[in-house]
Amino acid sequence: MTLAAPARHALTVRPVRLADAQSLQDFVQALDPASRRMRFHGAINGCPPALLRRLTEADGVRHVAFVALDSAPQCPAIAGEARYVANAEGDAAEFAICVSEAYRGSGVADELMRQLLNAARAAGIGWLYGDVLAENMRMAGFMRRQGFALAWPFDAEAGIERWERAVRERPQHRKRGFGRWLGMWLNREPVAAR
């Protein structure tokens, strides 16, 4: 899968490989301190070896991870990364996603989430959930747009909220009344009356 990057280069989204260790380390180290804190829920310096192992050792079954790559020489090799880790029962998985500052707002996160949802659906996982710092308004907006709902303030003391959604496709609801009219006007497509 390729998509347009900010500098009009093609990005490729693929599963993480062990050979991505150096690129993932560079990606994490290039994040500003606030972005690292939002992604890892705490201050980290660089990319410690234990973290690097967790980022690269995805088995493709219980732990699935993707990277968005930019091959342009002046751009970072990894534009974003996303992953999920399934629970012991295999019916739900916690996910995480992070996009380099240079690629935010370019659709990279949307494509990474699409890949995660497709992989989870194929694995029979019913729910994805993510724990997000309450102050991370950008991520909260992204989660809403992706169909996630705030499940509960997970840890009010730490300021972490849990967002979740079903992995299945979003249901298409029948539009009625004003909502039906507005939907037709916005979509500019005729909607058959039922």
Residues of each region from the PLM?
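Long, contiguous binding/interaction regions
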Residues: 1-194
